[in-house]
A protein has these predicted regions:
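Conserved catalytic core of the tyrosine transesterase superfamily
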Residues: 1-250
Length: 250
């Protein structure tokens, strides 16, 4: 039953959620880890009745050999799987509700400390619409470890906050799923539901998450300028290093 359900889950990810085959298979492999764990310990619980304690024990055992980012993806896959089960009326409860992803940690540029990034975020003027956008943008840029090109290309249809991940098109047009912390989600949601909603969005730019005041997709140059200005506002004179596009150019 588990493997048949896992196959159906992967079809759901592709057809209903629009994820690539590689991404769906990747999530399926995470579920396969759970299946192997259940087989190893002769646990007979099914997708419909597996309990939270069993899932918690599985995550604890497997997570010991994974870094924080891989742990977060595993938990994201499990959450997606059991939300799929609820979607298919396979169960009424959500056994992953109390199992949280680990802190992934901020991917820092070479020249900035965590304290400096926190100071930058705290310094942003939230009395303006751009301030709310910039805080959400910088929070996502660093907390999710995105390249600038990935940030400006991010679309509303790439946000899967119910499953705690975003879909990113990386180098070579390869799709990947990036876990996103609840705090970062909150910042982005506030921007989308408030400041972004007030914009007159230009035709063809409706799906981009981060927009300029004319309702158009931001450019890389704009991102660099915004981050540099925020850094300078707290007295940071050092060069700000951001992860750039696939070409590695700045």
């Amino acid at each position: 039953m588990w493997r048949e359900t896992n196959i159906a889950f992967q079809h759901y990810l592709r057809l209903q959620r629009g994820l690539s085959q590689n991404t769906a298979v990747s999530y399926g492999l995470d579920i396969e880890k759970l299946i192997c764990y259940l087989e190893k310990y002769n646990i007979t619980e099914t997708p419909s009745n597996i309990e939270e304690d069993t899932l918690r024990q599985f995550v604890y055992e497997v997570a010991k050999d994974l870094n924080a980012r891989s742990q977060a993806r595993l938990i994201s896959a499990l959450k997606s799987f059991f939300k799929f089960m609820m979607y298919e009326k396979g169960r009424e409860d959500f056994p992953m509700s109390l199992i949280e992803s680990p802190k992934i940690g901020v991917k820092l540029p070479d020249t900035l400390s965590l304290q400096e990034i926190d100071a930058m975020l705290a310094s942003i003027d939230l009395s303006t619409d751009e301030g709310h956008r910039n805080k959400a943008m910088i929070e996502m840029l660093y907390a999710c470890g995105l390249r600038v090109s990935e940030l400006i290309s991010l679309r509303l249809s790439d946000l899967f906050f119910d499953e705690d991940f975003i879909r990113v098109m990386g180098k070579g047009s390869k799709q990947r799923l990036v876990p996103i912390e609840a705090y970062t989600q909150k910042q982005v949601k506030q921007y989308i539901d408030n400041q972004r909603r007030q914009l007159k969005i230009a035709k063809g730019h409706e799906d981009f998450v981060f927009l300029n005041r004319r309702g158009k997709q931001l450019t890389r140059a704009m991102i660099f300028t915004i981050v540099r200005q925020v850094a300078e506002s707290i007295g940071l004179q050092k060069t700000i290093s951001l992860r750039c596009s696939a070409s590695g150019s700045s």
